[in-house]
C-alpha cells in the first residue's frame, strides 16, 4: 500500500487567540493532486502556509499538532526551513515574478544554492519552462523582463521557478483565480501534466476545477475539515449535508 508523503495530524493554527484551523488531520499521497475547497476564511490557505512554515515570521501565529513530511517533523528545531521550502514549493494566488528576466526568475533559487555553471543553469531553465508548459512561448524572450508577460504567462513562469528547485510537493494557493478562463485552462493542463512527477495541494474556489483535475478533495468550513476523500465520490455522493450544499452552490 502506498505510504503518504505528507501527514497532518490534529493540526490547529491560531492567529492571536483566534483559531483559524481546528484539529485537522489529513494524509497526502505521492503523485496526486488534492483540492482544498470551502468558503473564504475556512482555513484552506492557512493549512498550506502551515505545511511549509510560512507563518514562522509572524509572531501572532501559533500552532499545535504535527506536520510530517516523509516521516520527519516539519516543526522540529532541526528542520532547515530553507531546505524545507525547496522540497515543498509554493505558488501564490497573484503571479509574483521578480523584476528581472525570465531566465533569472527561473534560476533564482539555484543561484541562492551557489550554482553558477552556465550549462547547468541553461538546462534547468529549459527543463523547468517546458515542465510549466511555457517554453515555446518564451524561449526567444528569456532575457526580457518577466513583468512584460501576460498574467497567465507570469504564473507559469512562477511555476517554472518552483520546479527549478526540484521540489517533491507543490502547494498552489488559488493559482488561477486572478486569470482569464483561457489562461486558467493552460495552468490546469500544466498541473495535470506535472502529476507524474510531483504531489500537489491546490486551493481553489472553482468546483469545476476541483472536479476536473484533483484525485482527492478536502472540504473546509469555519476552520474544520468537514469531509475528505476521493474527488469523484465526494462530488457524486457527498457524505455530509454541508458538503453537498457547498458543491451545489447553496452557499459559498
From Swiss-Prot:
Record GO biological process: phosphate ion transmembrane transport
Q: What does this protein do?
A: Part of the ABC transporter complex PstSACB involved in phosphate import. Responsible for energy coupling to the transport system.
Task: Write down the EC number.
Answer: 7.3.2.1
Annotated compartments:
Cell membrane
Outline the extent of the ABC transporter domain.
Answer: 6-247
**Quaternary structure annotation from Swiss-Prot or TrEMBL:** The complex is composed of two ATP-binding proteins (PstB), two transmembrane proteins (PstC and PstA) and a solute-binding protein (PstS).
GO cellular component entries:
plasma membrane
Using the UniProt record, give the first listed, main subcellular location: membrane
Could you tell me the keywords of this UniProt record? ATP-binding, Cell membrane, Membrane, Nucleotide-binding, Phosphate transport, Translocase, Transport
Q: Which gene encodes it?
A: pstB1
Which PROSITE patterns does the UniProt record give? ABC_TRANSPORTER_1 (PS00211), ABC_TRANSPORTER_2 (PS50893), PSTB (PS51238)
Q: Where does ATP bind?
A: 38-45
Q: How does it sit in the membrane?
A: Peripheral membrane protein
What molecular function does GO assign, one term?
ATP binding
Q: Which organism is it from?
A: Streptococcus agalactiae serotype V (strain ATCC BAA-611 / 2603 V/R)
Q: What is this protein called?
A: Phosphate import ATP-binding protein PstB 1
Spans through the membrane:
none
On the tree of life, the source organism's domain of life is Bacteria
